[in-house]
């Protein structure tokens, strides 16, 4: 196949720190190829770049980073981690596509694979022994040949975990490989619960509805006449009508006599009204002790008006 690489990766001790190794990928074909790197332990390793393009008859150096282990493995411990490098030819129809998107457009028969084993160094002699095997060509397989049933490869992350950013100086840092699913810390729990508490504390209390009652105000339209008092219909008997007529005639006679005897009663003396009792009321109702003058027939009213006109004329002649 076009892609060639080493069959093993040796990680020098101590392994409780961040360990970096270089892996060289070579393209021996006269055409460009695309590659991507997978591993059986994606949470333990970081590969930069984890995929890309290799031009014809050229090579690319890939950096493999081992996250710090929580404890140093015993001598002779066998590492079960593996890497899988997949490659395919970049045909003209795939030239403009992203490397991460070309794998869905390529058939499995056109994808070649190379497996790489991970080894923990045990000393200078062991490291030299592995260094000799480091340059041996890796086993070449294709997707048509099934791989081991126990191997489950996943694309490697291209970024180092932030919790191990200070492990390059050799300081031992805890590893997440032994326990990938870690329980959230107390600070994280408090942080997640903080918005609920703050939301309750800063929530404004509901304002109580106002119980004030506005006093009703009476508005009177301009030039609006005051309401007239409603007259209550009364039923009168024939005797009452006769008595009313008699009293009306008496009032007229008294008015004539008083006009003839004292004509000066109309000369501004408001206290002597034409023999009629005062009637004062705020709503048209007679006060106590007042005499109610019954209604006079229209003819009598006309006669009275005529007499009053004559009296006024005579008074005018006197003055």
Curated annotation (Swiss-Prot):
Q: Which GO terms describe its molecular function?
A: endoplasmic reticulum-autophagosome adaptor activity; endoplasmic reticulum-plasma membrane adaptor activity; phosphatidylinositol binding; phosphatidylserine binding; protein-membrane adaptor activity
Transmembrane annotation, as ranges: 299-319
Where is this chain compositionally biased, Low complexity type? 127-150
Q: PTM Phosphothreonine: list the residues.
A: 236
Top-rank taxon of the source lineage equals: Eukaryota
Which residue stretches does the UniProt record annotate as biased composition, category Polar residues?
Answer: 151-165, 185-201, 231-244
List the InterPro entries hit by this protein, alphabetically: Ig-like_fold, MSP_dom, PapD-like_sf, VAP
Query: What cellular-component terms does GO give this entry?
Result: cortical endoplasmic reticulum; cortical endoplasmic reticulum membrane; cytosol; endoplasmic reticulum membrane; lateral plasma membrane; nuclear envelope; plasma membrane
Keyword set for this entry?
Endoplasmic reticulum, Membrane, Phosphoprotein, Transmembrane, Transmembrane helix
Signal peptide range = none
Q: Give the primary localization class.
A: endoplasmic reticulum
Where does this polypeptide localize? Endoplasmic reticulum membrane
MSP domain segment(s) = 1-121
Which SUPFAM superfamilies does UniProt cross-reference here? PapD-like
Residue ranges, Cytoplasmic compartment?
A: 1-298
Annotated membrane topology is: Single-pass type IV membrane protein
What does its UniProt record remark on the domains? The MSP domain is required for binding to the FFAT motif of target proteins.
Assembly description:
Interacts with epr1.
Q: Provide the family line.
A: Belongs to the VAMP-associated protein (VAP) (TC 9.B.17) family.
**Known function:** Vesicle-associated membrane protein-associated protein (VAP) implicated in maintaining the cortical endoplasmic reticulum (ER)-plasma membrane (PM) attachment. ER-PM contacts function to modulate the distribution of contractile ring components to ensure robust ring assembly. ER-PM contacts function also in controlling exocytosis and maintenance of cell polarity regulating cell shape. VAPs play an important role in regulating eisosome assembly. VAPs also contribute to ER-phagy by tethering atg8 to the ER membrane, but also by maintaining the ER-plasma membrane contact.
Q: What is this protein called?
A: Vesicle-associated membrane protein-associated protein scs22
């Amino acid at each position: 196949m076009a892609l060639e690489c080493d069959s093993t990766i040796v990680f020098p001790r101590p392994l409780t720190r961040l360990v970096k190794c270089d892996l060289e990928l070579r393209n021996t074909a006269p055409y460009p190829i695309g590659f991507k790197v997978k591993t059986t332990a994606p949470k333990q390793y970081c590969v930069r770049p984890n995929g890309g393009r290799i031009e014809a008859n050229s090579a690319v150096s890939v950096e493999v980073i081992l996250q710090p282990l929580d404890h140093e493995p015993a001598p002779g411990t066998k590492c079960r981690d593996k890497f899988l490098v997949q490659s395919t030819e970049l045909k003209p129809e795939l030239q403009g596509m992203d490397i991460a998107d070309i794998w869905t457009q390529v058939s499995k028969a056109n994808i070649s694979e190379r497996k790489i084993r991970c080894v923990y160094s045990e000393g200078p002699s062991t490291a030299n022994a592995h260094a000799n095997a480091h340059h041996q060509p890796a086993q070449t397989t294709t997707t048509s040949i099934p791989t081991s049933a126990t191997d489950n490869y996943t694309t490697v992350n291209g970024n180092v975990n932030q919790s191990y950013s200070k492990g390059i100086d050799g300081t031992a840092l805890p590893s997440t490989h032994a326990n990938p699913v870690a329980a959230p810390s107390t600070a994280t729990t408090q942080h997640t619960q903080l918005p609920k508490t703050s939301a309750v504390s800063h929530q404004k209390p509901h304002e109580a509805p106002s119980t004030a009652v506005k006093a009703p105000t009476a508005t009177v339209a301009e030039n609006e006449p005051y309401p007239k008092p409603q007259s209550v219909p009364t039923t009168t008997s024939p005797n009452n009508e006769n008595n009313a007529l008699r009293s009306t005639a008496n009032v007229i006679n008294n008015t004539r006599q008083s006009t003839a005897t004292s004509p000066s009663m109309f000369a501004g003396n408001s206290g002597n009204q034409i023999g009629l009792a005062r009637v004062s009321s705020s709503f048209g109702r007679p006060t106590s002790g007042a005499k109610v003058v019954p209604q006079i027939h229209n003819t009598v009213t006309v006669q009275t008006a005529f007499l009053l006109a004559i009296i006024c004329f005579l008074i005018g002649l006197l003055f």
